[in-house]
């Protein structure tokens, strides 16, 4: 409770109104991941997001490793003010906070998983984010089949899902399952606070049709979309996906929300952050914002 009061007091000091009319009426908005742009919880991420033409940035919670909590600057009131005011000043939103530490750490083996989720939810309060990204990549594969691991995962996700729901937020999980598997898992979890963070890369890498999969999942199960593929070429040159077809599917589903760029970097020039991400942002905006 003391920590939460500290967060609230920080918010009272620095909470600002987003610029009027900014991105008004946009059905689809485009963001990029700060950790993939080498700007994890760095103040320069907002200026960079503006420079590449993005509407927002998905902020990471910071490294986890063997730490008890994320190495998260947003627990510090001074950083709360600095990050929020800087984002406001350049007109960049933070639609989501990512717990990328769980790409390597096992969610099932963290006894303090509730504390980690609470840390994320409080950081979301600071930045005005609604979606928390929880990848299950570090949790192995045992949970994908019936058994003790799945039972425990379902229990934990229901619990943290209810934490998110009561806070007016959503935890979006990346599972690498197909649409049928995702629907089954969500049905078992039984919490409106848990949805799917759909990843185009997972679908393409596993030979699945993203358009068909999205349609099977349905609008209400998809919280947000990582709209990029495995590093090879930028999206505008990648023959592995028909992004116009993806848009038509989302239009037909009446889905709206954030498309977040994680990868799709030129494999021969992966560290050219501005070049890769500005090109991908421009391509997604051309299709999803200009192509009415």
What are these regions (language model features)?
Residues 2-3, 25-30, 38-55, 179-292:
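Histidine-acidic metal/acid-base catalytic patches
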Residues 9-19:
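Bacterial N-terminal signal peptides
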Residues 19, 46, 50, 86-90, ...:
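Active-site acidic/histidine proton-transfer and metal-coordination neighborhood
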Residues 20-24:
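Sec/Tat signal peptide C-region and signal peptidase I cleavage site
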Residues 36, 61-63, 100-103, 136-140, ...:
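Active-site-proximal loop/turn and secondary-structure-junction residues that shape catalytic pockets
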Residues 58, 96-98, 133, 172, ...:
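Conserved beta-strand positions in the central sheet of alpha/beta enzyme cores
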Residues 60-84, 136-144:
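Glycine-rich, proline-tolerant flexible connector loops at the mouths of alpha/beta enzymes
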Residues 73-80, 111-118, 146-157, 209-215, ...:
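Charged helix-capping and loop-helix junction motifs
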């Amino acid at each position: 409770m003391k920590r939460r009061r500290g967060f609230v007091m920080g918010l009272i000091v620095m909470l600002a109104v987003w610029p009027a009319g900014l991105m008004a009426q946009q059905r689809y908005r485009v963001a990029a991941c700060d950790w993939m742009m080498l700007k994890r919880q760095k103040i320069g991420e907002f200026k960079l997001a503006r420079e590449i033409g993005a509407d927002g940035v998905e902020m990471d919670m910071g490294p986890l490793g063997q730490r008890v909590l994320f190495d998260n600057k947003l627990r510090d009131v001074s950083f709360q003010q600095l990050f929020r005011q800087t984002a406001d000043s350049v007109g960049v939103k933070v639609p989501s906070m990512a717990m990328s530490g769980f790409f390597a750490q096992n969610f099932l083996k963290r006894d303090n998983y509730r504390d980690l989720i609470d840390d994320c939810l409080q950081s979301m309060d600071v930045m005005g984010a609604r979606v928390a990204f929880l990848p299950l990549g570090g949790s192995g594969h045992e949970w994908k089949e019936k058994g003790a691991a799945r039972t425990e995962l379902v229990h934990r996700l229901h619990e943290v899902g209810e934490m998110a729901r009561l806070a007016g937020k959503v935890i979006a999980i990346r599972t690498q399952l197909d649409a049928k598997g995702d629907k089954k898992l969500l049905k078992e979890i039984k919490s409106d606070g848990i949805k799917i963070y759909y990843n185009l890369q997972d679908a393409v890498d596993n030979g699945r049709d993203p358009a068909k999969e999205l349609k099977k999942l349905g609008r209400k199960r998809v919280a947000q979309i990582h709209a990029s593929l495995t590093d090879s070429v930028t999206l505008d040159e990648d023959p592995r996906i028909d992004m116009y077809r993806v848009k038509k599917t989302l239009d037909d589903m009446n889905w709206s929300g954030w498309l977040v760029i994680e990868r799709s970097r030129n494999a021969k020039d992966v560290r050219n952050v501005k070049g890769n991400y500005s090109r991908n942002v421009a391509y997604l905006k051309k299709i999803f914002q200009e192509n009415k």
